[in-house]
Every structure is written in C-alpha cells, then in structure tokens.
Amino acid sequence: MTDRKTNSARDRFMSAICRVAAVALVGSALSGCVAADMALDDVPKAPPQIPAKVLAEMSKKGMKAESPVLVRIFKQESELEVWKMDGSGRYALLKTYPMCRWSGKLGPKTKDGDRQAPEGFYHVSSGMLNPKSQYYVSFNLGYPNRLESALGYTGESLMVHGACSSSGCYALTDQGVGEIYAVVSKALSSGQDRFQVQAYPFRMTPENMALHKDDANLPFWKTLKEGYDAFELTRQQPKVSVCGRRYVFNTEFEGGEPRDPLAACPATAKPSDPQLVAKIALEKQKVEAAVTKASSSTVMSYVDGGMHPSFRQLLKKDGPEKLAARISSIKYPVSRPDAALADPFKAMTKRTGAGQVADAPRGD
C-alpha cells in the first residue's frame, strides 16, 4: 500500500514537471510570468517557514517576525532588500538578497511583450502570494498599478520568484525567495494589510543619477527618487498618491485621495513636514549639481537584463546547467544565459566625473 501511494505521488509530481516544461516552451514569448507561474496544485508542498538563522537576526536587530515588512529592488545592482519595522517603529534593513536574473533594461515597463521588469511603487496583499508557484514560491507585484493603468501601460502577472529565469520578473534562488516569502507571509498574517515594494533602476544617489543623465527616463527616475529619499531620511514607509501623471509622496489632499491619476493634483489639505521637504529639496539640488558636472552618459550595450555578479561568476565557471541545478529545486533553465554573461553596467561603476556606484547598508 505504501509503495502504491509513493508511486502515485511520484506520478503526480512528474506530470506536473512535464506541464512545467511545456509552459517553459512558450514562456519566453510572454510579457510576464503569468503562464510560466502556474500553480502546481497536485504537488504537495508546505509553504516555507522563516529559518532559525533569520529569526535570530531579527531578534538581534530588535525586530519581531510579526512586525511589518517592506521590500526594495534595485535593477542595476541586482539586489533585493527586505526591511522590517523594529522596536523604534522605524524600518531597518534585515537582509539583502542577490537577484539571479531580471530581464529587459533600466526603465519602467510600459507594454505587453517588452520584457521589462517593472519600476515604481507597488503594494502586495496576501492574495497575491503563490505558495505553489512553478518557480518554487512567488508573489505578484501588482503591475500595472493605478498610475500605470491610467497611463495605458499593459502587461500582467509580474512576479518575484525563484529559479534563475525572467521574462519581466525578478528571479532569485529558491532558498532566497523562500526566506522572503516566509517573512512577508508572516507579516501579512499578523495584521499588515499589504506590504510596499519599491522597485528602482539603481540606488538613487546623485552620483548614480548623473551616470544616467542622458537617459530618457531621467525625469521619471527623479520622481522615484522623491519616494526613495523620503524612506531614506525617515525610515518610514512613504504614503504614495498618484495625480498629475506621477507619484506624489506623503501628501494630504483636500477631499481625500485624488481619484484621477491623469488629472492635476488637487490642493493640499495641510503642509507636509517642513524638515522633510527641506531635506528632499536639498537632495534635488545635489542631483542637479551632479548631473550638470557629469560628462555624457556611457551608452550601455544591453543584451537582455542583468544578473548579480556572484551568479555571473558561477555561470562563467560552471555553465547554465550546473547553475540551474544550484539555484532551482527543479533545475529550471537559466533564461538567456549568453545575455546573462554580459554586464552592461561594468563601465559605469568606476567612471570619473560622477563617482562610483554607492554601497547600501547590507544584510548578511
């Protein structure tokens, strides 16, 4: 009887893997991970739990597993940060995870099929978590958000998931995304209604902004930097509104939240924190000074997206098959491995005239 049950479970698992392979054949033609992130309902799998090492790190930093969480993503650096609220009521960095793969190039996602990974501000609720993802576990970023929908941007089901494969998603190791999933799931089940994801092209320092001074997305990135600075300066989650075709942060409006993202912003109900406004204004001045001083931007030669240097070294050393086996529990193939070997940002990290890419406080 035991052997019969074992064989039945094995057959269901192999059937699911066959479906995964079939989906993978068409996944590269899709704009997001929607078809490639099917739920494997007949494969028994318990949701990941927070590892003891991560719980110990939380305790060391004055955090509780139940406390609110916030996620930041940086394309150029191929890093994802998990922040937790500590005993002071402010957010502190818990851990930084290297991303194995993201697709497209720097800049927002605007249309179905452009392979772009989203940039902007997103909010993830428990219903957007997938514990039975083909890519181990995943959560949906919620693209397009209200602003993107109003602007006519198209695409759907852009995820953070496991395996080293991306078609508009952010991909990590199964172990890494399992930790992240467990941390955010615990926060959501403990009372946090939804957690904020801030997806950036790079760490939004004046020096990095200057490195991209000639990019057509610079005006959009300056808007993102306002939210970035608000978090950096306060360690509080910024309140995000949308009006005037852009994000607006930490602002109370007469009549409540603006209803039309494309209409001009209504009058404010009360002044924003003057000290914070002054500090953000100073950051804007630093950006303008750095951009003015910098020479023309280096033209980056994109093939397709990026990969954290640690994974690129493994890819060069071991090849895509061994890297896939190391990253993914089902050895899901690395997407476009030849493109992953290219580093379009290498020439930018040590340029004179605009400084180096800044280091953020890092987890272990």
Language model regions located:
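Bacterial N-terminal signal peptides that target proteins for export
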Residues: 4-21
